[in-house]
Amino acid sequence: MDNSKAKIAVVIPAYNVENTIVKVLGGIPKNVSSIIVVNDASRDATEARIKSVRDDRITLISHKKNMGVGGALLSGYSCALGKGAQVVVKLDGDDQMDPALMPNLIDPILNGQADYTKGNRFLHPVALRSMPPVRKVGNLALTFLTKIASGYWNVFDPANGYTAISAAKLAALDPRRIARNYFFETSMLCELRKLNAVVMDVPMPAIYQNERSSVRLPREFFIFSTSLIARIFDRIFSRYFLYDFTAVSLYLILGSLLCLFGGIWG
């Protein structure tokens, strides 16, 4: 299949990335049809830097209020679908994702091998050495919980934000079910499972710049934990009660009742 004529859109959520956004935009491959940059109410010169880039493919969306990475992406995704994109790639504006690796994400979708592709830094053992130990441990824990919540047991590194999705699956997603914060990627996986989407991991190096992260770790850890637990229960309910009812459903009911009685009278 000739993928050179496919309509590819790249969505870039941009928040306080004045030092890197121009380089990121300059590195996007020429075969990309549309570049949609969402300035999520940056407090620095991000918007001015975006406007300084002369590229007719660029569409700038400016949020007056910060909507979070998920909110920014949903704005960009909607715009990409409106432009008739076949595949939509999500690329961060902090220069931690190599645009040259984009074909590795796009080709499996165009060739019918996957509906959604994502980077996996754990499949790149040499570059993985640059990942801080705290990130490794946190990512392993997050991966395990995400496997339970989403049902994608073959997927690793769920927080990796370098992704691509087919227009068909993107249009089928319910945006109301997608998180607006840094739980965005994980919530995408959970919702894609409901659509029986094929998800594929793509080896990708871990790149870390000297940019200061805007993530508040204690707050985001609490949000991730509670959101994952909620998604786990949502998956159990959807799979064993809403869409089907099997012997496992009965076991879950009986087991829950026994635990309840044991907790009260045990």
Question: Where in this protein do the model-derived segments appear?
Answer:
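Short beta-strand/loop segment that forms part of the nucleotide-sugar
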Residues: 33-42, 61-62, 91
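Acceptor/aglycone-binding surface of glycosyltransferases and processive sugar-polymer synthases
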Residues: 63-82, 87-89, 99-182, 209-219
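Short, well-formed alpha-helical segments that are part of the catalytic scaffolds
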Residues: 15-30
